[in-house]
């Protein structure tokens, strides 16, 4: 009340007050990062408990909820490393989780037994992940590159004795898709190029291998039915988008199961095959379809208006679901939903109670024409105070990849920047996934060229919006988006007033020559897309690498990097910063000693995001 009385005493103060109110509430980075993130959400065998991971302590730990009493217990107390829950052992009801060291991506699997963690997959510089359980539930399947860092072999471990046996030795960089319910069949894929995969059905008993992929296309395995009669997979060989097919193991007959005008991302059958879950990437939003196979009816979930359901996980009795849902204004939340009575319970409360969602920005899908007339999809986040009279600066946001996609959902850095007066245009440049295989392939061996022009034309589109200050537009991106940021500042030095490079590639020759050994299954695909750094392609890779053209940079840049990043090595950013500074460029450099390819800890995000805002405030706003 006093605020409004004071405003009335002075016309000038009234104007200032009105401006403040029109902007909505500005939140500090500490307030925004008091939001929590959660992942997982797995039922115990009797569906009485649910476990999930949350970073409410600053790093991800594991929490168990008694669904009858709603009582929650913190099961781990890590201070440094993030623990990501993988589920319960169906036999012993013990918790399995995954963790690496300092973001190095060498994740191991751990079992919590008698309140102590046991490393099930020990070894230096090795990586492992859970793949499923044997039919008798006594053994856990997992893949590990402990024998050869380039290849992941298939193992099973007895969950009681912890004895480990190799099931399949992998010498061709196969990627495991599925293991049959009867433990006899294994389906694995082999990446040939960005537009071609092979998929095989392997009989572990007879050692016979049959190719499921019958056309040159992309294939992704989606699992067996409960009787191991049919295998399900997605492919795009008869169109632009992925659709769901079935393959009869006995006859080899193929049938279409589900097709729409967007990519079917994944699909699975519940334990008794009562329901089929289908996830669709529909214009940068997730759409979930759950079909009751008894009558082919759709399951409609009540209480999720305004939210995108990202995923669902069924209890073994198929009566209760874990649902993960989010929106642009809300970080993902975990719910349980009872199909017998439509009872909905919210498990997490990840949005800080001090934040009013109405003060946050809603992502809106827009499209604009690029230099050659190609329609480029993007997501626009507009500040509350942006008007024709109160123009705002803007940033072009470039996603990772190559081949990634900016999607509708909550991103704390975007919300922080928009909340403090910056419009964000998250560009899905040519080469992005989700818009058909033709669009996806348009940047092959053309990276940093036409896709970069798409970003520049995104800037031109922003300049046409009446609420944008057309002289104050920068560019920001992480990983491949960090490369695009540096490419823009290097090869289009007059286009963007500032650039924020978050662990971006700046020397493609070195990066492609030093990719982690465990990426062997994707190496050929990456080389065919980007170019082989050990061939004449290295000339082009050199030419598009910002490091070697630092003399072109004119405007201020900021670089953020994790010292343990196995994908984009620290030396990439070190050398880029040194080169830019040698030509008199203003550079801010923030290095996290305990981070990898991404900043998992809240303290890293708070420091990094606040310094990004300070940088753009001082150099752009």
Show the residue positions of the predicted features.
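Sec-dependent N-terminal signal peptides
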Residues: 4-12
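Cap/lid segment of the alpha/beta-hydrolase catalytic domain
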Residues: 349-471, 478-479, 506, 513-521
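Beta-propeller blade-edge and WD-like acidic-aromatic loop motif
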Residues: 21-26, 53-74, 100-119, 139, ...
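Extracellular/periplasmic ectodomains of large secreted or surface enzymes and adhesion receptors
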Residues: 24, 33, 268-278, 290-302, ...
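Conserved beta-propeller blade repeats
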Residues: 35-51, 80-98, 109, 124-143, ...
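Positively charged n-region of N-terminal signal peptides that target proteins for export
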Residues: 1-4, 621
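Active-site-proximal cap/loop segments of hydrolase catalytic domains
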Residues: 429-621
């Amino acid at each position: 009340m006093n605020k409004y009385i004071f405003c009335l005493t002075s016309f000038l103060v009234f104007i200032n007050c009105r401006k403040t109110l029109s902007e909505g509430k500005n939140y500090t980075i500490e307030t925004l990062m008091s939001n929590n993130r959660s992942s997982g959400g797995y039922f115990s065998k009797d569906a009485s408990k649910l476990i999930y991971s949350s970073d409410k302590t600053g790093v991800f730990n594991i929490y168990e909820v008694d669904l009858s009493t709603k009582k929650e217990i913190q099961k781990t107390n890590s201070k440094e490393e993030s623990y990501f829950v993988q589920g319960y052992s169906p036999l012993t009801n013990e918790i399995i989780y995954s963790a690496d060291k300092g973001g190095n991506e060498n994740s191991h699997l751990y079992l919590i037994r008698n309140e102590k963690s046991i490393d099930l997959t020990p070894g230096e510089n090795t990586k492992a992940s859970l793949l499923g359980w044997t039919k008798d539930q006594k053994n856990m399947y997992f893949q590990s590159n402990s024998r050869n860092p380039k290849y992941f072999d298939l193992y099973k471990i007895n969950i009681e004795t912890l004895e480990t046996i190799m099931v399949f030795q992998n010498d061709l960089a196969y990627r495991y898709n599925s293991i049959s319910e009867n433990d006899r069949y294994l389906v694995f894929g082999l990446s040939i190029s960005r537009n071609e995969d092979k998929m095989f059905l392997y009989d572990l008993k007879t050692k016979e291998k049959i190719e499921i992929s019958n056309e040159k296309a992309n294939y992704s395995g989606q699992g067996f039915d409960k009787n191991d009669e049919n295998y399900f997979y997605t492919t795009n060989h008869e169109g632009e988008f992925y659709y769901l097919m079935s393959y009869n193991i006995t006859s080899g007959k193929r049938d279409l199961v589900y097709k729409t005008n967007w990519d079917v991302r994944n699909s699975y059958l519940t334990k008794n095959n009562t329901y089929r879950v289908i996830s669709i990437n529909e214009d940068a939003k997730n759409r979930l379809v759950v079909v009751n196979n008894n009558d082919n009816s759709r399951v409609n979930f009540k209480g999720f208006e305004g939210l995108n359901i990202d995923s669902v996980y069924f209890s073994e009795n198929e009566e209760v679901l874990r649902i993960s849902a989010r929106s642009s204004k809300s970080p993902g939340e975990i719910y349980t939903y009872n199909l017998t009575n439509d009872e909905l319970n919210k498990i997490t409360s990840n949005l800080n109670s001090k934040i009013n969602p109405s003060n946050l920005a809603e992502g809106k899908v827009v499209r604009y024409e690029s230099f050659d007339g190609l329609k480029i999809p993007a997501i626009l986040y507009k500040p509350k105070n942006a008007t024709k009279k109160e123009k705002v600066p803007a940033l072009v946001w470039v996603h990772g990849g190559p081949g990634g996609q900016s999607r509708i959902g909550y991103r704390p850095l975007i919300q922080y920047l928009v909340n403090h007066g910056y419009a964000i245009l998250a560009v899905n440049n040519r080469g992005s996934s989700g818009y058909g295989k033709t669009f996806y392939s348009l940047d092959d061996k053309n990276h940093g060229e036409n896709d970069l022009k798409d970003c520049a034309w995104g800037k031109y589109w922003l300049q046409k919006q009446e609420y944008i200050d057309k002289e104050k537009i920068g560019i920001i991106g992480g990983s491949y988006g960090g490369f695009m940021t540096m490419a823009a500042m290097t090869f289009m030095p007059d286009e963007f007033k500032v650039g924020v490079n978050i662990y971006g590639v700046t020397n493609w020759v070195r990066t492609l020559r030093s990719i982690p050994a465990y990426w062997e299954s994707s190496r050929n695909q990456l080389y065919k897309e980007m170019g082989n750094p050990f061939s004449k392609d290295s000339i082009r890779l050199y030419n598009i690498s910002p490091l070697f053209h630092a003399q072109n940079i004119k405007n201020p840049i900021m670089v953020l990097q994790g010292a343990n990043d196995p994908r984009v090595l620290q030396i990439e950013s070190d050398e880029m910063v040194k080169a830019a500074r040698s030509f008199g460029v203003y550079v801010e450099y923030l290095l996290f000693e305990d981070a990898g390819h991404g900043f998992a800890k809240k303290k890293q995000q708070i420091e990094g995001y606040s310094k990004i805002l300070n940088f753009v405030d001082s150099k752009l706003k």
